């Protein structure tokens, strides 16, 4: 049964860093990513171009109307906390508009952090599965390496995404 398959997480707060906090971000997802109107976004938009509803402060001008406007892409999108990691840890107090020379790298780093957060989410889910005790030290090691990539831009640059994917798949 499902109840027998899962156990309590080692630390219930480990998932906290995977919770989006748009108020602590600068709307990077609304700029860095490609949007398609057919997928429930307000417009067809190329990656690197700001959404037409993104305000200067990084917040959405129509956030309170997303449901009414049936913008399911916006409603369902979850960066798993990548936005706030980039804006608070890797590029603190850096608004992409104020630093056009860093814009491309910042957007690229956002995508990389998002992918690392996805790996992190799956690894944390594995720690809650019964029968994974033999793999716990490998899981913990990989989780710590991913978290250390978020210390600064240099650490993220040195983190091999393909290596992390490969190691996570082996576990």
Please provide the spans of the model-predicted regions.
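Short loop/turn segments that flank or connect secondary-structure elements
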Residues: 2-171
């Amino acid at each position: 049964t499902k109840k027998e398959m899962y156990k309590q997480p080692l630390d219930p707060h480990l998932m906290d860093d995977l919770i989006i906090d748009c108020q602590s971000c600068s709307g990077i997802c609304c700029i860095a990513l490609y949007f398609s109107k057919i997928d429930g976004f307000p417009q067809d938009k190329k990656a690197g171009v700001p959404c037409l509803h993104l305000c200067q402060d990084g917040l959405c001008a129509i956030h309170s109307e997303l449901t009414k406007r049936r913008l399911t892409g916006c409603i369902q999108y979850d960066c798993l906390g990548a936005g706030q990691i980039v804006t608070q840890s890797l590029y603190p107090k850096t608004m992409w508009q104020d630093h056009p020379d860093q814009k491309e790298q910042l957007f690229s780093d956002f995508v990389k952090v998002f992918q690392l957060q996805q790996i992190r989410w799956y690894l944390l889910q594995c720690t809650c599965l019964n029968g994974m005790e033999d793999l716990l030290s490998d899981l913990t090691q990989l989780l710590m390496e991913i978290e250390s990539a978020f210390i600064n831009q240099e650490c993220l640059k040195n983190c091999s995404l393909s290596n992390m994917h490969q190691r996570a798949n082996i576990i």
